[in-house]
Design a protein with these regions (language model features):
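Sec-dependent signal peptide cleavage junction
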Residues: 21-42
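N-terminal extracellular ligand-recognition/capping segment immediately after the signal peptide
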Residues: 78-79, 89-100, 104-139, 144-159, ...
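Short glycine/acidic-rich loop motifs that flank beta-strands on beta-rich extracellular proteins
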Residues: 118, 150-157, 177-182, 285-287, ...
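Parallel beta-helix/beta-solenoid
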Residues: 136, 143, 153, 158, ...
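Ser/Thr/Gly-rich low-complexity blocks that favor extended beta-strand/coil architectures
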Residues: 176, 182, 198-249, 392-428
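Small/polar beta-strand repeat architecture
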Residues: 234-285, 422-465, 473
Length: 661
């Protein structure tokens, strides 16, 4: 029976004294007790998690199969939800579970509504909606423009790991309180490294005991920094400072003691009047969307305003991921950072490609996007056609063609196709496997164990990835970190990033090779100001080189088939484009416009090339608005082989610098 009674309430006070109200969900009205909450006025700030009483635990494991109509399960918002902060967590979890159990069901939110949700076991949950072990195969969630607000700012939102064919669209996600706290320095004792901060009224995170628990531990030699400590960030400054302790001294002021290891930095940068943010460092593994070990995934028209850690994470995915019109931006009412401690998008070791279009990443503390494939360790060589391997770095399948690499030098030992995969030591083959090859790799020495050889599956490394019409701006990290195969980045904009706009590098923790890479018709302005002085100006806004951006001599050139064309580089801090350990590189039809004098950033050049071969630089325009470039094109003669420089236009003081040593 569908009830259609209407309730007229003259005021919020009247609403709160009513003993019961009608709640509307799944198209029917259900009698429920009114939640008892303390609702402060807007002048008194936002409501904290401690003021919310969860009264709907009986809805935690409901089966709403009988509410499905024409393949759609609709979750409607309570009429009083904006005032009562009704916790929809149990209802949404039950609705998702019902949709999973009824294949093909679409879960729809009410259009343009607001849903508050808490996890089952706060603060111990990793996600508000935990379905990582449900092995989902087919799920569609349509937000219809609604806003989902997480009541616990220390956890993520959706964990859909081990899933396939999942689509989420047209939904905004926020937290009631951001995963950081913001304020203004009102006093600073440089000798004691103690500051007083007047907090913005919207922030109440200092009241949460979980933050206090994440401060440093006490050891025999006194207080030491813990890697999980919160840390301070200063607006428009690249340094951060670890926090040892804090205490509230009034309703609006806190006193913060900084870690002595960062004291030498604070003397130069922290001043009274500075705007600072206290970041919850421990939540690096907390993401709004978690798609580890997953297949086909689609996210469309999603806005993320705040995240305790990062935005979207995936590991060892075997299917494609499509991201369209994803926005990770700060809510201007709640502070300056969108993602608290981790990357906007972080996908590693994926067999599938990533298609990303029309996305915006703004004011992220870490990188906007990481896509990379790792080498896997060969734990023991049994024979020229058989070895034991750690396979957690990338999902292997029979028929894959893999390379065996010598770590350190990057030397290619050999290539072969996988004939068979067998479980190793009782583990799944995507954790550890005995790898049988179709043909022998004769240079692989039998009997050697961990650390001598790595395997690499480059032909299944994000092959076919496309990133188009996206904007990356005002972040403290990098724009794109890519170690992939067959990737196109086109018509994107990179503005005012502390680090590189794009980085591809040979690195033990963030991938190894960038192959068949096209970077075309992009605009880059004012990036890389964090690293401009540590590398003598040779670190580029676009940087493709070896570990830690070094330009080292190597017989094996890691990156290959690189095209940089039709881009506009403006106002770069030290270098626009850095190329190292690359082969078959084309730099064509770009515009380089340097606006800073050389004495500002030690050594200014537009293009820097080292330890590479088969490089063509042609039909580019180099313009220096201020004199003093050390060479628009700068390269090392001893390590660059077969370089062609032709048909370029130079409107600068020095066109070319060849380093002889």
């Amino acid at each position: 029976m569908v009830l259609k009674e209407k309730i007229f309430v003259g005021s919020l006070a009247a609403l709160l004294v009513i003993s019961s109200v009608f709640t509307v969900f799944f198209g029917i009205r259900v009698w429920k007790p009114a939640p008892m909450v303390d609702i402060p006025s807007a002048e008194e700030g936002t409501v904290t998690l401690s003021s919310i009483k969860e009264t709907e635990t009986d809805y935690e494991n409901q089966d709403f199969s009988d509410k499905i109509k024409d393949g759609v399960l609709t979750l409607e918002a309570c009429g009083a939800e904006k005032d009562s902060l009704y916790n929809y967590g149990p209802l949404i979890r039950s609705a998702i579970r019902t949709a999973i159990q009824n294949a093909g069901t679409v879960l729809e939110f009410q259009a343009d509504a607001t849903y508050y949700a808490a996890p089952v076991d706060s603060p111990n949950s990793a996600a508000t909606f935990e379905f990582g072990e449900d092995e989902i195969d087919g799920l569609t969630i349509k937000g219809n423009g609604s806003r989902l607000i997480l009541l616990d700012n220390f956890v993520g939102c959706f964990n859909f790991s081990n899933s396939n064919n999942v689509t989420v669209e047209n939904l905004s996600i926020d937290t009631l309180e951001p995963p950081n706290a913001q304020g203004t320095v009102t006093a600073f004792d440089k000798e004691k490294q103690v500051m007083t901060v007047e907090t913005d009224r919207v922030y109440t995170m200092f009241d949460d005991p979980r933050l206090q628990e994440r401060l440093t531990t006490k050891e025999a030699n006194g207080t030491v920094r813990n890697k999980n400590n919160p840390y301070l960030l200063k607006e428009n400054c690249t340094n951060y400072y670890f926090v040892n302790s804090y205490k509230k001294i009034s309703d609006t002021e806190i006193q913060i003691m900084l870690d002595p290891q960062t004291a030498n930095l604070t003397n130069n940068y922290i001043e009274v009047g500075d705007k600072i943010t206290l970041n919850n460092r421990k939540n690096t593994s907390t993401f709004i969307f978690n798609f580890m070990y997953s297949g086909t995934t689609t996210l469309k028209d999603i806005t993320i305003y705040n995240s305790a850690g990062g935005g979207i994470v995936g590991l060892q995915n075997y299917g494609d991921m499509t991201l369209k019109n994803i926005q990770m931006i700060p809510d201007i009412r709640k502070g300056i950072w969108a993602c608290g401690t981790a990357d906007g998008v972080h996908i590693q070791a994926s067999r599938g490609k990533v298609i990303m279009e029309d996305c915006l990443f703004s004011h992220l503390v870490d990188d906007a996007m990481n896509l990379y494939q790792w080498y896997g360790d060969i734990s023991k060589v049994v024979s020229a056609t058989e070895f034991d391997a750690v396979t957690t770095t990338s999902p292997l399948q029979v028929g894959d063609t893999i390379e065996v690499i010598e770590p350190g030098t990057g030397r290619l030992v050999g290539t072969a196709k996988i004939k068979d995969l067998q479980p190793l030591n009782g583990q799944r083959v995507d954790r550890a496997a005995k790898v049988i090859l179709e043909t022998p790799i004769s240079d692989m020495q039998t009997g050697v164990e961990t650390g001598r050889y790595y395997w690499y599956n480059k032909d299944k490394s994000f092959v076919g990835t496309e990133i188009r019409n996206c904007t990356f701006q005002y972040g403290r990290g990098r724009g794109l970190v890519l170690c992939t195969t067959d990737t196109v980045v086109e018509n994107c904009t990179f503005t005012s990033l502390s680090n590189q706009a794009v980085q591809g590098w040979f690195n033990g923790t963030e991938g190894y090779e960038l192959q068949n890479f096209v970077f075309r018709n992009n605009t880059l302005t004012g990036c890389n100001y964090l690293t401009r002085e540590v590398d003598n100006g040779q670190n580029g806004m676009v940087q493709i080189s070896t570990n830690n951006n070094a330009y080292v001599q190597s017989t094996y050139l890691t990156h290959s088939k690189i095209e940089i064309s039709g881009n506009k580089f403006t106002d770069y801090h030290g270098c626009a484009l850095g190329i190292g350990n690359c082969r078959d590189v084309t730099i064509k039809n770009n515009v380089f416009n340097q606006k800073e004098a050389a004495n500002v950033y030690k050594k200014n050049n537009s293009v820097y090339i080292s330890n590479s071969q088969d490089v063509t630089v042609e039909d580019n325009r180099f313009q220096d608005d201020k004199p003093g470039l050390t060479g628009a094109i700068r390269y090392r003669a001893a390590s660059v082989r077969n370089i062609v420089i032709q048909n370029n236009t130079f409107a600068c003081e020095q066109a070319l610098e060849i380093i002889k040593e």
